[in-house]
A protein has these predicted regions:
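Conserved ATP/PPi-binding loop(s) of AMP-dependent carboxylate-activating enzymes
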Residues: 354-358, 366-399, 437
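Conserved adenylate-forming
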Residues: 65-70, 162-172, 177-219, 231, ...
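AMP-binding/adenylate-forming catalytic core of the ANL superfamily
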Residues: 107, 124-126, 267, 383, ...
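Conserved AMP-binding/adenylation subdomain of ANL enzymes
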Residues: 198-217, 225-265, 280
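AMP-dependent adenylate-forming
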Residues: 3-4, 26-50
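Conserved AMP-binding/adenylate-forming
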Residues: 19, 43-47, 63-110, 221, ...
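Gly/Ser/Thr-rich phosphate-binding loop
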Residues: 264-268, 279-347, 360
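Structural core segment of the AMP-binding/adenylate-forming
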Residues: 67-68, 95-156
Length: 543
């Protein structure tokens, strides 16, 4: 970065402190504009609220939190499966001036206690399924108020609250702790201020669902504790209602009745669920015979063949984005017009899109020097959607935000048109015979075989090469009968030949193992760390 001019009148300029806009003000604006339009539908729990009713409920909860002792910047831990009152909780915590801390509800009691120790909650909102956790938290000395999902404070739309709510905040007051997946250690709390979260939501509106309004409907398919929560909050600008998927986990059988029944126009999901949406699309219907305008997917790579099938059945409604918790996913976007003409590099890897609005992507080498188009390095990001840092993790902050950029840990390159291609993660890389190997390239090649459902390649210690690659495969269909071992051997031989034909020799996995089900983390990500530990046992140390 260049030095500041010493002759400029702005050389010593310091911005004046100013009051921020509480993100919950967006809700009030929409409630004033379209008070009687639907905002939330949760038919499993018998809840349907208008925007005015949601605003009143947020006000009532904020008043209860402040009465219970929650001050500005105090943490409110929110632990619950999806429910209309989780949506009320998000808006109510924001309005109170507290900080939303929503860990994955699938975490164990011990894991939740670890997160609680990290963020020191002043209050807890939980569903009854987490009563044991609340008891355990109290045993550690927690004495703050507890609010139960299903029994949160209510208020009639337009009613004057009995307790006045002070929702004023500084623009740099934290308002959301967005937990990382913790796949390489305990989750970190990426901290978003009201200024950051406002920018994130406006970015989502601008890039992901720019034309949505109160006549549409957004289907909630994933836990609101992570990216789906951001997607839900972003619907406020258009006044689009959030419909919580009824009947439990989304399946091929339940998705289309929900999409058709509610007239869904947008949804945020992962490739696995998008594949179910495409697979379950009723036969005899064409791409124009549904209401979907934007199906937004992220969280994992999607095979080109799966993309092609979804495009063929659903038409040009797919939107892909890439990002991490520290940027709430807001790094790249692959728009509908890019799908079907998706740029592919020489290794057959597809792009994850161009930079999101207001975001700059920078590729750097090991020394932090910016690299030109076409050269591979670490993917770094700058922009208003990048979090303020990790709560209480100075070492992680120094590493991840070195040089003023957020270092994603992903490896890739930009082409001349600004498309980003990811080739791996720094943490996944292993060194075999002195050469760096990034598993992603190998995994994407293995996934082109129709008998492979999932593939993970990990580096394990080897006395000759330092490390070797081990491929762990979950088959699309497990073989049965007496010849199942032979079928596995045949597939392993075919996959080895596939790798030899498409990769440099040092990248070809030395071993291939099959598992019935691939292990995943509580956040649904493939458990690489667990697989690496399992297949490294008894092999000694690589270095």
């Amino acid at each position: 970065m260049r030095a500041i001019s010493q002759t400029s009148p702005a050389r010593d300029f310091t911005p004046t402190p100013r009051r921020g806009v509480n993100v919950s003000h967006f809700l009030t604006q929409t409630a004033r504009r379209i008070p009687d339009r639907l905002a939330v539908v949760d038919d499993d729990h018998g809840q349907r609220w208008t925007w005015a009713e949601l605003d009143a409920r947020a006000e009532a909860l904020a008043a209860a939190l402040q009465t219970g002792g929650v001050d500005r910047r105090d943490t409110v831990l929110l632990v619950s499966a999806n429910h209309a009152e989780v949506i009320q909780s998000f808006w109510g915590i924001l309005r109170s001036g507290g900080v939303i801390a929503p860990p994955n509800a699938a975490l164990s009691t011990e894991e939740l206690l670890g997160i609680s120790a990290e963020v020191a909650p002043a209050a807890v909102i939980a569903d009854r399924a987490h009563a044991d956790f609340v008891t355990a938290l109290k045993d550690t000395g927690f004495t703050g108020p507890v609010f139960w999902i299903g029994d949160l404070p209510t208020a009639q739309a337009g009613a004057v609250p009995t307790e006045a709510v002070d929702s004023t905040v500084d623009e740099d007051d934290p308002c959301w702790y967005f937990f990382t997946s913790g796949s390489t250690g305990r989750p970190k709390a990426a901290t978003f201020t009201h200024r950051h979260l406002g920018a994130v939501l406006m970015n989502h509106r601008c890039d992901l669902f720019p034309n949505e309004d109160e006549t549409g409907a957004s289907l909630v398919l994933a836990p609101l504790s992570h990216g789906a929560g951001i997607h839900m909050l972003g619907q406020v600008f258009g006044g689009t209602p959030s419909i919580i998927h009824p009947g439990g986990k989304p399946s091929v059988e339940t998705l289309w009745p929900a999409i058709d029944g509610y007239g869904i126009t947008n949804a945020f999901t992962v490739p696995t669920i998008l594949n179910r949406i495409a697979a379950g699309y009723p036969s005899g219907r064409g791409p124009e015979d549904h209401t979907l305008e934007r199906v937004i997917y992220a969280g994992a790579p999607m095979l080109a063949a799966d993309q092609a099938r979804a495009l063929d059945r659903l038409g040009p409604c797919l939107v892909q984005y890439f990002g991490l918790a520290e940027v709430t996913g807001a790094i790249t976007i692959l728009r509908p017009e890019d799908h079907g003409t998706i740029p592919v590099d020489d290794a057959g890897i597809g792009t994850c899109g161009r930079a999101r609005t207001g975001v700059e992507i920078v590729i750097v080498d090991e020394g932090g020097t910016q690299l030109p188009a076409g050269e591979q390095g670490e993917v770094c990001v700058a922009g208003p959607t990048v979090c303020a840092g990790y709560l209480g993790r100075p070492d992680a902050n120094a590493e991840s935000f070195a040089g003023g950029l957020f270092h994603t840990g992903d490896v890739g390159y930009l082409d001349e048109r600004g498309y980003l291609f990811l080739t791996g993660r720094k943490s996944d890389m292993y060194i075999s015979g002195g050469s760096n190997v990034y598993p992603r390239e190998i995994e994407e090649l293995l996934l082109t075989d129709t008998e492979v459902a999932q593939a993970v390649v990990v580096g394990v210690p080897d006395p000759q090469w330092g490390e070797i690659g081990v491929a762990v495969i979950e088959r699309a269909q497990s073989p049965t009968g007496a010849d199942s071992d032979g079928a596995g051997a045949d597939l392993a031989e075919r996959l080895t030949a596939l790798c030899k034909s498409g990769l440099a020799k040092y990248k070809v996995p030395k071993e291939i193992h099959f598992v019935d089900t691939m292990p995943v983390t509580a956040y649904g990500k493939l458990a690489r760390k667990e697989l690496k530990a399992e297949y490294s046992q008894g092999r000694g140390s690589a270095r």
